[in-house]
Amino acid sequence: MNRSVILSDFDNTIVNIDAAAFALDHFADPSWKRIEALFKAGKITFEDSIREEYAMINAPENVILDALDRVVSLRPHFDELVEHCRKNNLPFTVVSAGLEFTIRHFLNQKGWLKFIEIYAPKAEYTSHGYRLRFPKFFDESSINFKHDLVKYHQKRGSRVIFIGDGLGDFPAAREADLRFAIKGSNLAVACLKGNIACSEVIDFQEVIDETRNYVG
């Protein structure tokens, strides 16, 4: 493999909180947590859990973004990671099950949309909450759309560096060539239990330092 790509989760990874969970906590029926519990128990798929949860959110985009602007901040040294990727021609994609318009909003504040791709379900606000349109799988055998994107890049000769924090990230992280998990996160615990090599990090300087040999 002669090229590397970075795929990173957004909520609780690039930013300091789970922005989607914040929206659910503040603007959705509390029963969304029952759906989340079903996913964690392995009774429904990652995509189905997100689809059902977001359908419970009763607030337009501008209301959600106004609330998030007061509480969201970037994890330390993410600015430097973006610059590191730009200078070294290292493709960077946010792969997230979060609300796509929130990701676009915070990246656009920094002018990063020209450098960073977003791979996430499109969310449309309706009278029945948010309706999602997930990316079409490249390989129907994939566990979820994040896992699918890792395999897509690998099949095209790229080495995949994955960064995340949640259980929904685990299939992608397990498949990736190099993986980082936010320290103490569900992903870090899952990798430890699965005996999968994973660097636990608290900020993005550690990612920059460990990926210097992967550029180009």
State each model region's role.
Residues M1, I17, K43-S49, L65-R70, ...:
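Short acidic/polar alpha-helix capping motifs at helix-coil junctions
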Residues S31-A37, N62, L113-F115:
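Short, surface-exposed acidic
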Residues L7-D9, V95, I163:
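Short hydrophobic segments within beta-strands
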